Amino acid sequence: QLAGEDAGGVFTFAFTTFGQHMFMAAYFGIRPFQITDTGEKYTFGDYLGLRLITCGLAILVGFGYVLVSGYTFEKAAVVFLMVVYKVIDALADTYEAEFQRSGRLYLTGKSNAFRTILSVTCFLGSLAVTGELLTASIWAVGAQTVGFFLFDFLVIRELPNVTWKSAQGKKFQLFRDNVLLFFSVVLDFYIFSASKYAIEVHMADRDLAVYGAIFMPTSVINLVAGFVIRPYLTKLAVDWETGHLKAFRKIIMNLA
């Protein structure tokens, strides 16, 4: 409503569809693997090294997409900026997964909350003042970058026992262990979003804005399911590896 229906459709596609798809590519499906790696088969440096590679590739794919898409300059810029926003989110996810793996889930929640509040406030404030989606997107990316630096990058450096080194060949081994997870999350999200891609190609931007509002409850259900299950994964991994099967089964029953 602040920028009009057409801008709403552009943002819906840029943020919840293509941008989120690039998040999934950069994310690589590693989060569940990392937070359950309580035996530290891989170091934080291994996870971060692979995530930097996947984030870089996601940026390149996003840039290539907007080059060949035939969009106007403003739409292409908004789509690419939302790709950058989501890729920064994927990079921050590596740090937040390490917080959880080290038993500091509260830091994960704080980081996610503070980054989201900062970026959403800057985005909506800019949009309300200027009415320009492109300007608001620039502010959102800037706020996301600052939030990542303050609430992830600086925080993890204060934690003990975080191993930044990565042994030769470990990133490739980690890639091999997670490549099927990568395909599963990318293909799953494509199936989830195929209707939005079809509308974006064959209908007007304002139609996608309306469809996005109708589609939103499905996204919320999926998001809430993640909030409920994900915090328990590290505890489940610890109970399984230490042989505390009674506690393991109790958590499973509570979740069920």
What are these regions (language model features)?
Residues 23-42, 101, 214, 219-243, ...:
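Helix-loop junctions and terminal segments of transmembrane helices
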Residues 13-16, 20-25, 52, 56, ...:
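Alpha-helical transmembrane segments of multi-pass membrane proteins
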Residues 106, 110-111, 134-140, 149-193, ...:
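Interhelical loop/hinge segments that connect adjacent transmembrane helices in multipass membrane
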Residues 76-83, 109-159, 177, 215-218:
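Hydrophobic alpha-helical transmembrane segments
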Residues 13, 39-53, 175, 212, ...:
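Interfacial transmembrane-helix starts/ends
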Residues 16, 51, 79-82, 86, ...:
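Residue-level signature of transmembrane alpha-helical cores of multipass secondary-active transporters
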Residues 1-23, 76, 133-134, 138, ...:
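Interfacial/gating helices of multi-pass transporter permease domains
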Residues 30-42, 87-113, 134, 241:
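Membrane-interface junctions at transmembrane-helix termini in multi-pass inner-membrane proteins
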